[in-house]
């Protein structure tokens, strides 16, 4: 059993080292790719994404505002009628 531990440990260490080197190369390649993608998407999709987010926030604001108004009207009507 002891004779198998050293070669097994060596294989594991070499595997970890090669894996870390591959991850570093992959990260460098992804950085270069993201810079290229960022340049393409910022020209075409940047304004579209911004407009989409602004419209979404406006719609959410309108819905929340309407809910607050409805709740306020319901409470006021309840107090006027004396049902609360």
Curated annotation (Swiss-Prot):
Residues 1-22 form the signal peptide. Keywords: Amphibian defense peptide, Antibiotic, Antimicrobial, Cleavage on pair of basic residues, Disulfide bond, Secreted, Signal. Disulfide bonds join 78-84. Expressed by the skin glands. Its main location: secreted. It is found in: Secreted. Coiled coil: none annotated. GO terms for cellular component: extracellular region. GO terms for biological process: defense response to fungus; defense response to Gram-negative bacterium; defense response to Gram-positive bacterium. Pfam families: FSAP_sig_propep (PF03032). Residues 23-36 form a propeptide. The keyword Secreted applies. Belongs to the frog skin active peptide (FSAP) family. Esculentin subfamily. Has antimicrobial activity against Gram-negative bacterium E.coli ATCC 8739 (MIC=6.3 ug), against Gram positive bacteria S.aureus ATCC 6538 (MIC=3.1 ug), methicillin-resistant S.aureus ATCC 43300 (MIC=25 ug) and B.subtilis ATCC 6633 (MIC=25 ug). Has no activity against fungus C.albicans ATCC 90028. This is Esculentin-1SIa. It comes from Odorrana ishikawae (Ishikawa's frog).
């Amino acid at each position: 059993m002891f004779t198998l531990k050293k070669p097994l440990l060596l294989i594991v260490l070499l595997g970890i080292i090669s894996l870390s080197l591959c991850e570093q190369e992959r990260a460098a390649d992804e950085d270069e790719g993201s810079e290229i993608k960022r340049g393409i998407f910022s020209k075409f999709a940047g304004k579209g994404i911004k407009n989409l987010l602004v419209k979404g926030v406006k719609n959410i604001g309108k819905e929340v505002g309407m809910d607050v108004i409805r709740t306020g009207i319901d409470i006021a009507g309840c107090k006027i009628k004396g049902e609360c």
